[in-house]
């Protein structure tokens, strides 16, 4: 049996690289599942239908460990394929709120896992942004950012609400040029997204 790692979205690429290098596991670039192998999957919500279909087609001769990062209000929990994928495989999550939600609402057994280490990136010589925020747009985030900019007109803000920095390299560059990174939840009652904090700390913020 071999253990391999899959990244379903570019935002999880660094996590996948660190895990594979630390444990000397193969990072799959072209997914061709083999019998008896175990696949650790970051961002499985993006690939739910494909992952489930492959498992059915190969008669469950291989397994997944799903590292869920979605919050309890996520639209992906309305995806029947993602729920079925989690019910058929091992699921791990980084916060107890989502673990309890999945158990109670979908009868999905969830294990907790530790915070993965990030690579330490070289720091930029000059941090040109005082405050940085990158994330999806919603009313609360927009209103909060507008208030901060009005209250602190002398600070230089970098704000991206359109996810222009989806790639790891692009995101790392911006964070390495920022002094402070804001971590604002998208959903109400959000769990603390420690993986975002780890990324910012790795970039010296």
Describe the predicted segments one by one.
Residues 2-36, 40-205:
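Nucleotide-sugar donor-binding catalytic core of glycosyltransferases
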